[in-house]
Design a protein with these regions (language model features):
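Bacterial Sec-dependent N-terminal signal peptides
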Residues: 3-7, 14-45, 215, 248, ...
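Membrane-proximal, proline-rich intrinsically disordered regions
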Residues: 23-77, 328-334, 339-357, 361, ...
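Short, surface-exposed recognition loops and adjoining beta-strand edges that mediate ligand/DNA contacts
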Residues: 35-38, 69-76, 164-184, 228-311, ...
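Conserved, well-structured interaction surfaces
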Residues: 91-167, 206-211, 221-231, 408-415, ...
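TPR-repeat structural position
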Residues: 212, 257, 436-437
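Flexible, polar/acidic helix-loop-strand segments at domain edges
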Residues: 345-418
Length: 547
């Protein structure tokens, strides 16, 4: 990828243009429309624009011709369709079918280039902010900005590390690639704000330990400086609670359960808010589109290109209840049948998916166009979406204001990047791994207080139960992937009654091979230290299950 791993000094950020930022740079706008490190050092307004660009870039469209490339939430969706709890109806409009079908996942395809280049451009945007602030001479506002730069860089590297790290699978237990090189625990190259041109051309994949230490250092700096922020701008920016949450994620990845438990609790306490209520989650106008209910999220505005495009955004793909979006046109989102069946009927979260006809939960489903009419002496919901959405279809992510007809309103929505609920589950899993029984108690307390007053678990695998409840809680938020890969969980799409498309019914023994992402060929070409040390291509590594 061009200029991905060059020093930011004197180098333009590939793809990070002023259109991705919320403020213009009047006195420092170059002819190319891009931002350089020197400009940031000399212009306060340029620095402000770069800081504003951090949350803005995550919502930006990578390529308007590739409708699956609408930013971080598109990458979240990529991870979701690689699991077995998230099912998409097979349809010609399904832009994400290659990832579900595990095809075109090798290093030479555009699909992989989107993920790789998007993350590294985000890293470079963070590097610009970090490099622009001298902490010894900075104002309080500048120190807060420095903390933001470190937090964003850490968050992006943590995602990349968990996606690109090669872990053993049933396809390649020896962890050797096509060249015979052992790639176990290798992640991706680390590009910092001080990396020079020469070093960038010989920048190897970091080991798990090297990457862990780097991210931990960034989060330590974020923790130190982010307290100087005066506002998290209505949860669109990370704050101290979010930094603690990122640390909890990091320590889980590193299997440091004591620290994961510690920082999950710090995140909960520092945030101070409560988990979403049933009314919050199932509201037909604000259900899972209200950023005030989360620790950190992304908020679309009418000025975002993703909104102006109408169909290249989170709501278009995540919400089944629109007449303008991709999902509403056919490739609707469902929960895997095996997951739905396992949820207790007394757990109110189960109503966020369409119940089978005749189920006692059918009447509890709410639709954005619900309308009760008398039919044969019985009041019946004559919602058109009730008829259109398939059984097990999602009712979780509502269009803004419940407006399913006008994209200019419906997609001016928000999506979550971190919720406090995740921290409760991290705390429970970490506790259970440290002292069996303690985590299950934490889970039971959470479930009975917030999700299912009648909750009881009588099984013998507490870790499995904690992870299951976590996946139900965070369904569609791009996070199940990480637990599947980290905890070596099998993916099971093929079984009697499955609602997966027959060609996507892959069953694995442990984590799937397709969850080890390949580094793109362009990086190999520009960076010899990576060449020959890439992850093996996992495309079509499994045959579909046949009934």
């Amino acid at each position: 990828m061009k200029k991905i791993n060059k020093s930011i000094y004197g180098v333009l950020i590939a793809g990070l243009t002023l259109s991705a930022m919320t403020s213009c740079i009047d006195e420092a706008e170059p002819r190319s429309g891009s931002v350089t490190q020197k400009m940031l050092e000399e212009s306060a307004s340029a620095t402000t624009a770069a800081v504003n660009g951090l949350p803005a870039y995550g919502k930006s469209v990578w390529d308007k011709g590739a409708h699956w490339s609408y930013g971080i939430s598109a990458i979240m969706r990529i991870r979701d369709v690689m699991a077995d709890d998230y099912v998409v109806v097979d349809h010609d409009y399904n832009q994400f079918s290659p990832w579900a079908a595990t095809i075109f996942l090798g290093p030479s395809y555009l699909l992989g280039q989107f993920v790789y280049s998007y993350y590294y451009n985000y890293v470079l945007a963070s590097n610009l902010v970090i490099g622009a602030v001298n902490p010894d001479k900075a104002t309080k506002e500048q120190l807060g900005n420095l903390g933001l730069g470190y937090a964003y860089r850490a968050a992006n590297y943590l995602d990349m590390a968990r996606m690109y790290e090669f872990l053993p699978t049933d396809v390649d237990p020896a962890c050797t690639n096509e060249q015979g090189y052992n790639v176990k625990n290798l992640t991706c190259p680390i590009v910092t704000d001080t990396l020079g041109e020469k070093a960038s051309r010989n920048n190897p994949r970091a080991t798990h330990e090297e990457m862990f230490k780097f991210i931990e250092s960034d989060l330590n700096n974020a923790e130190k400086y982010i307290v100087n922020l005066t506002s998290n701008r209505n949860n669109t920016l990370p704050d101290l609670a979010v930094v603690y949450g990122l640390k909890a994620r990091l320590y889980m990845w590193n299997e440091d359960y004591a620290k994961a438990k510690e920082y999950a609790r710090k995140a909960i306490d520092t945030y101070g808010g409560t988990p979403m209520s049933e009314d919050d989650a199932t509201d037909t106008k604000k259900g899972f589109n209200d950023i005030t209910k989360w620790m950190w999220g992304a908020q679309y505005t009418t000025e975002d290109r993703a909104v102006k495009f109408g169909i290249i955004n989170f709501t278009s793909f995540a919400s089944n209840e629109t007449v303008f979006g991709y999902a509403g046109a056919g490739p609707m989102n469902m929960i895997g049948k095996s997951f739905y069946d396992r949820i207790s009927d007394t757990d109110w979260r189960k109503t966020m998916w369409k119940a089978p006809a005749g189920s006692p939960l059918e009447a509890k489903n709410k639709y954005v166009d619900s309308k009760m009419e008398m039919k044969n002496g019985v009041m019946e919901d004559v919602s058109k979406f009730k008829k259109r959405i398939p059984t097990y279809g999602s009712l979780k992510f509502r269009p803004n204001q419940g407006n399913y007809a006008e994209s200019s309103i419906g997609v001016v929505s928000a999506y979550p990047l971190m919720r406090v609920e995740e921290m409760y589950f991290i705390e429970a899993e970490a506790a259970e791994r440290l002292a069996p029984g303690t985590g299950l108690t934490l889970l039971e307390n959470f479930m009975k207080k917030y999700r299912d007053k009648q909750y009881v678990y009588t099984g013998s695998n507490a870790i499995d139960e904690i992870l299951f409840q976590k996946r139900i809680e965070l369904w569609g938020e791009g996070l199940s992937f990480f637990d599947i890969k980290r905890a070596n969980v099998s993916v099971t799409r093929g079984y009697a009654g499955t609602n997966f498309f027959e060609e996507w019914r892959f069953n694995t023994n442990g984590r799937p091979a397709w969850m080890n992402f390949c580094i793109v060929n362009l990086e190999e070409n520009d960076n010899p230290a990576v060449k020959g040390k890439n992850n093996p291509d996992p495309s079509k590594a499994y045959k579909p299950w046949r009934n």
